[in-house]
Amino acid sequence: MKKLNTWAATVLCAVLAACTGNDKEYDATGTFEATEVTVSAEQNGRLLAFDINEGDRVTTGQQVALIDTTQLYLKARQVGATKLVYASQRPDQSKQIAAVQQQLIKARQEQQRFAGLVKDGAANRKMLEDAESQVKVLERQLAALQSSLTTSTNSLNAQMGTADVQRLQVADELRKCHVSAPITGIVLDKYMERGEFAAIGKPLFKMADTDNMYLRAYVTTAQLKIIKIGQAVKVLADYGNGERKEYAGKVTWISAKSEFTPKTILTDDERADLVYAVKIAVKNDGYIKIGMYGEVKL
């Protein structure tokens, strides 16, 4: 009888040891999050179109709204017309200096002719000096005219360059009137409706990349030695009522500082007051939702 009691006590101790062992299904818990983007207006104007609703899926570059472009279109036309005016005012240098160049050619010919006559004794020195003086006058006149025309042309070219910059600015402003989705994901919130007045910096809608979710979990100091960035882990999405689904996860971030354990989080060591946040990337198959609880097995 004594041997039987000893055997029963041994079995009971083994069962209790198994029940109190650290063989949990998870090592850390947390909630699923997604990268959220708030899209704001980059131009002022009335919303002529805003054809998305909360819950809609949009793709990167997809146009979702249009801000009134009337005034910018008119401004673009004005800038284009201004550039044409500047272009028409640019002088044709070759035509405007042609007359003076022709006079200079004749004056040099006269200078050469008088130089020959003086050499032969058929003309006096005064006539040659007058011819040389005329050449110098025309050379100065041509140089001054060329300088003036160059200055005028450069000024008009600069004004045309300014018009080109203005045209690019208007084109950029027009582009910003066409509001597009910056990422692929789901529309979470819509802050305005078609017909309302949008202002620069005023939020239009918020969306999230729900294809690439991450679980923000918390680990204890003791667990830091068994987790590292890039590590593959098992993630369990908790659907409630004991229903879970397993996903492959990858540790992408570990906080450099500790924090007090959030009240809604369970850790491997329930006595731990300080924990470290970690992010675990998970590919979403459509079942994981923002705010859903999840568990991690390291």
Task: Describe the residue ranges of each PLM region.
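Bacterial signal peptide processing site
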Residues: 20-22
